[in-house]
Amino acid sequence: MAAVIAKSSVSAAVARPARSSVRPMAALKPAVKAAPVAAPAQANQMMVWTPVNNKMFETFSYLPPLTDEQIAAQVDYIVANGWIPCLEFAEADKAYVSNESAIRFGSVSCLYYDNRYWTMWKLPMFGCRDPMQVLREIVACTKAFPDAYVRLVAFDNQKQVQIMGFLVQRPKTARDFQPANKRSV
C-alpha cells in the first residue's frame, strides 16, 4: 500500500499539462499600432516664452486677437450650449492681479479664479437664445469703454461654474502684451 501511495504522489508531482487548443505565440501583436516617433527637436528650434510685456487673459490668450467672425462663432457656441453669457470690463490698471485689484486670501494668484473682479456690463444674459443680442451688447460695451479690457464669460447654471471666458477687446493703448509672433525668443 505504501508503494502505491508513493508511486501516486510521484506521478502527481510529474503531472503533464492537459492538452489545450491554445498555443503559445512567439510574439504577441499589439492591439494598437504605435504612433510614429517625431524627430527630436534641435536645441536651436526650442523657444523660450518671454515674461516681459506678455500678459495673458483666460481661454484664447495664446492666440492672436479674435476677429469679429471668430467672436461671433464663440457666441453661437455659448448660446447653442445653453450657457449664460455675461460681459465684464476693467480699466487697464485694474485688469491684472495686484494688491489694489484683488482680494487675497493667500500669497498666490492662479489667474483663473484669482479674486480679481471686473465690473459687469448690465446683468448676465439669462435665457438668451439670440446670438445677435450678445453681439449687440459687445458693441455697446466697447463703444462705452473704448480704453478698457472687455471680456465675455459664459456660465453653466447647472454645474454652477464659469465655463469659458475670453477677451473681446484689448485697449488700443495697451502695451502689456506681445503679438503672437513675438511672444517667444
UniProtKB/Swiss-Prot annotation:
| One Gene Ontology term from the biological process aspect of the record | reductive pentose-phosphate cycle
> Is-annotated flag, keyword Nucleotide-binding?
no
| Any one GO MF annotation of this record | ribulose-bisphosphate carboxylase activity
The Gene Ontology CC terms held by the record are:
chloroplast
Keywords, sorted A to Z: Calvin cycle, Carbon dioxide fixation, Chloroplast, Methylation, Photorespiration, Photosynthesis, Plastid, Transit peptide
User: PANTHER family recorded for this chain?
Assistant: RIBULOSE BISPHOSPHATE CARBOXYLASE SMALL CHAIN 1, CHLOROPLASTIC, RIBULOSE BISPHOSPHATE CARBOXYLASE SMALL SUBUNIT, CHLOROPLASTIC 1
Q: What does this protein do?
A: RuBisCO catalyzes two reactions: the carboxylation of D-ribulose 1,5-bisphosphate, the primary event in carbon dioxide fixation, as well as the oxidative fragmentation of the pentose substrate. Both reactions occur simultaneously and in competition at the same active site. Although the small subunit is not catalytic it is essential for maximal activity.
Please give the family membership noted in the entry.
Answer: Belongs to the RuBisCO small chain family.
Extra info from the record?
A: The basic functional RuBisCO is composed of a large chain homodimer in a 'head-to-tail' conformation. In form I RuBisCO this homodimer is arranged in a barrel-like tetramer with the small subunits forming a tetrameric 'cap' on each end of the 'barrel'.
Name of the protein in its database record = Ribulose bisphosphate carboxylase small subunit, chloroplastic 1
Q: Which organism is it from?
A: Chlamydomonas reinhardtii (Chlamydomonas smithii)
